[in-house]
A protein has these predicted regions:
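Short amphipathic beta-strand and strand-loop transition segments with alternating hydrophobic
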Residues: 109-116
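Short, glycine/small-hydrophobic-rich surface segments
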Residues: 43-48, 53-101
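Acidic, glycine-anchored loop motifs typical of Ca2+
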Residues: 128-136
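Low-complexity, S/T/G/P-rich flexible repeat/linker segments used as non-globular hinges
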Residues: 135-162
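Internal catalytic or translocation cores that form aromatic/hydrophobic pockets or channels
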Residues: 52, 106-108
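N-terminal single-pass transmembrane signal-anchor helix
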Residues: 1-34
């Protein structure tokens, strides 16, 4: 008669060590990917903002880019997404650009600023994804040259995983 097979303590130890090794590799990668999805909000927002700014400058050649708008919302969300109170995005520049961080009532993790000077602009997104008080910064720029507005290639990024 054959004895039913049992899992020995050695086999359990081997299985646990393999599982532990897999988790040691997978969990940090997963955490980085989760953070990366959050900073997509900043890059997508700046892409929309840059496109709107270039369209505004091309449509208003006598004015160029709109005037500056302060960091909006003024208090950068810290470690959690925030929903803006009504009126947060009513600044004339945000209205001229048709821009807000997210649709009304949808939480977001970044604040945005626009520094316009007629023939050039810098758009900035600032956030604190982990809530430690250290802000990440994303910037894109644009210029009016040779009669047409355009975005400067590349994006400045500082501490993107903060």
């Amino acid at each position: 008669m054959k004895r039913p097979s049992r899992i020995t303590p050695l086999e359990i130890a081997i299985g646990a060590s393999i599982l532990g090794s897999l988790l040691a590799v997978a969990i940090p990668s997963f955490a980085r990917n989760v953070h990366a999805t959050h900073f997509a909000e900043a890059t997508d927002g700046l892409a929309r903002l840059g496109t709107q700014a270039v369209a505004h400058a091309d449509a208003h050649k006598d004015v160029g880019f709109p005037k500056s708008a302060p960091l909006t919302p003024a208090e950068v969300p810290r470690g959690a997404r925030a929903v803006d109170p009504p009126g947060t995005w009513d600044h004339p520049t945000w209205t001229a650009l048709g821009f807000r961080a997210s649709p009304e009532g949808i939480p977001h993790a970044f604040s945005f600023a626009f520094d316009g000077a007629g023939s050039s602009f810098t758009a900035r997104a600032r956030g604190d994804l982990d809530g430690d008080g250290v802000l990440s910064t994303f910037e894109t720029r644009g210029v009016v040259g040779a009669g047409a507005a355009s975005l400067t290639p590349g994006m400045y990024v500082e501490a993107e995983l903060e």
